[in-house]
């Protein structure tokens, strides 16, 4: 099974680029930019990656992002992730970034997007890896601030395929952002949102019905509503599930309790992703390995999960078919 996982070409649809900031790069950038970080060494950082819920993770995640200042910093951050893609056979990736995390510190929107974009262009040139960029609004901030961020994104419409919604879920429902999502849709952006990770399944209904999204990030709480499960199945609405993240943030106590196999068996359109891999102990292959070792997943399940990620991506139908053919070739 592990050999199959490593062999298969994959797409990743739920990856926060700031969440791929490894401690080594964090220290290097902190030193270069003369930013104080509350850790004495790399081991100290790894020990701090011991989370009890989404918020305890976010506190550390935002502190880590402080070291990202220049365009080159965002290039290096993205490039290090691309090297992991090469290692894990990811041939298409759709990357989230959180502009508000950076603009709040005085780093310009242009600095962030240009650094990321340059690295992705090099990834295409050197490794043939295709990519899309999705800009996320921070849901703990106001809709008004989200509108400001949307305005900043407009000059970069050609570089950003969609908008999403992330950060602290509890108490920040999708309904808080109806108008800005409506405007984003009018501007031609594709729409996704984190929903049903920690908060209950009502947030998934809101994301579908009020924000009109075309992909749900996480969505594991959907299992608590038979009606919602049936709807997700009927619509083949993609769910970008992140197993390591769910365990690290205590959404499930352990991998054996994870519901990904149940969701898949029900007929939902499920994909596997790494979310914030530097913080959650593993990139995409490790997520696949962890679930395959702890759940009764078959080789066909793994192939389905991989194919779902291409089918649910924002690339052209022609490219999807090319990639699905490559999966079939790898299966042999």
UniProtKB/Swiss-Prot annotation:
<dbReference type="InterPro" id="IPR006330">
    <property type="entry name" value="Ado/ade_deaminase"/>
</dbReference>
<dbReference type="InterPro" id="IPR032466">
    <property type="entry name" value="Metal_Hydrolase"/>
</dbReference>
<dbReference type="GO" id="GO:0009117">
    <property type="term" value="P:nucleotide metabolic process"/>
</dbReference>
<dbReference type="InterPro" id="IPR028892">
    <property type="entry name" value="ADE"/>
</dbReference>
<feature type="binding site">
    <location>
        <position position="276"/>
    </location>
    <ligand>
        <name>substrate</name>
    </ligand>
</feature>
<dbReference type="GO" id="GO:0043103">
    <property type="term" value="P:hypoxanthine salvage"/>
</dbReference>
<dbReference type="Pfam" id="PF00962">
    <property type="entry name" value="A_deaminase"/>
</dbReference>
<feature type="binding site">
    <location>
        <position position="14"/>
    </location>
    <ligand>
        <name>Zn(2+)</name>
    </ligand>
</feature>
<keyword id="KW-0479">Metal-binding</keyword>
<feature type="active site" description="Proton donor">
    <location>
        <position position="197"/>
    </location>
</feature>
<feature type="binding site">
    <location>
        <position position="16"/>
    </location>
    <ligand>
        <name>Zn(2+)</name>
    </ligand>
</feature>
<dbReference type="GO" id="GO:0000034">
    <property type="term" value="F:adenine deaminase activity"/>
</dbReference>
<dbReference type="GO" id="GO:0006146">
    <property type="term" value="P:adenine catabolic process"/>
</dbReference>
<dbReference type="GO" id="GO:0005829">
    <property type="term" value="C:cytosol"/>
</dbReference>
<comment type="similarity">
    <text>Belongs to the metallo-dependent hydrolases superfamily. Adenosine and AMP deaminases family. Adenine deaminase type 2 subfamily.</text>
</comment>
<feature type="binding site">
    <location>
        <position position="194"/>
    </location>
    <ligand>
        <name>Zn(2+)</name>
    </ligand>
</feature>
<dbReference type="InterPro" id="IPR001365">
    <property type="entry name" value="A_deaminase_dom"/>
</dbReference>
<comment type="function">
    <text>Catalyzes the hydrolytic deamination of adenine to hypoxanthine. Plays an important role in the purine salvage pathway and in nitrogen catabolism.</text>
</comment>
<protein>
    <recommendedName>
        <fullName>Adenine deaminase</fullName>
        <ecNumber>3.5.4.2</ecNumber>
    </recommendedName>
</protein>
<dbReference type="GO" id="GO:0008270">
    <property type="term" value="F:zinc ion binding"/>
</dbReference>
<keyword id="KW-0378">Hydrolase</keyword>
<keyword id="KW-0862">Zinc</keyword>
<keyword id="KW-0546">Nucleotide metabolism</keyword>
<feature type="site" description="Important for catalytic activity">
    <location>
        <position position="218"/>
    </location>
</feature>
<feature type="binding site">
    <location>
        <position position="275"/>
    </location>
    <ligand>
        <name>Zn(2+)</name>
    </ligand>
</feature>
């Amino acid at each position: 099974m592990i050999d199959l996982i490593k062999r298969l070409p994959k797409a990743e649809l739920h990856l926060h680029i700031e969440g791929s900031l490894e401690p080594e790069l964090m220290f290097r950038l902190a030193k270069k930019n003369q930013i104080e970080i509350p850790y004495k060494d790399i081991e100290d950082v790894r020990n701090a990656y011991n989370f009890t819920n989404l918020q305890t993770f976010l506190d550390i995640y935002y502190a880590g992002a402080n070291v990202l200042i220049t365009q080159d910093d965002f290039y290096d951050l993205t490039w290090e992730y691309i090297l992991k893609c090469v290692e894990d056979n990811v041939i298409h990736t759709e990357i989230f970034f959180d502009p508000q995390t950076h603009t709040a510190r005085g780093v310009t929107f242009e600095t962030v997007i240009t650094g990321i974009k340059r690295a992705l262009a090099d990834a295409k040139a050197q490794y043939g890896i295709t990519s899309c960029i999705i800009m996320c609004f921070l849901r703990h901030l106001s809709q008004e601030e989200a509108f400001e961020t949307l305005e900043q994104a407009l000059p970069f419409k050609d570089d950003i395929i969609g908008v999403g919604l992330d950060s602290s879920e509890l108490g920040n429902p999708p309904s808080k952002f109806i108008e800005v999502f409506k405007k984003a849709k009018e501007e031609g952006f594709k729409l996704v949102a984190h929903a049903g990770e920690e908060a209950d399944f009502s947030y998934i209904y809101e994301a579908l019905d009020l924000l009109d999204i075309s992909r749900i990030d996480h969505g594991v709480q959907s299992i608590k509503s038979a009606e919602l499960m049936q709807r997700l199945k009927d619509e083949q609405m993609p769910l970008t599930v992140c197993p390591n993240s769910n365990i690290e943030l205590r959404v499930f106590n352990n991998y054996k309790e994870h519901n990904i196999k149940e969701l898949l068996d029900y007929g939902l359109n499920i994909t596997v992703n790494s979310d914030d891999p530097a913080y959650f102990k593993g990139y995409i292959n490790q997520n696949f390995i962890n679930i395959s070792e702890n759940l009764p997943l078959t080789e066909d399940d793994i192939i389905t999960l991989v194919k779902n990620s291409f089918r649910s991506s924002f690339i052209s139908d022609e490219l999807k078919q090319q990639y699905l053919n490559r999966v079939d070739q790898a299966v042999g």
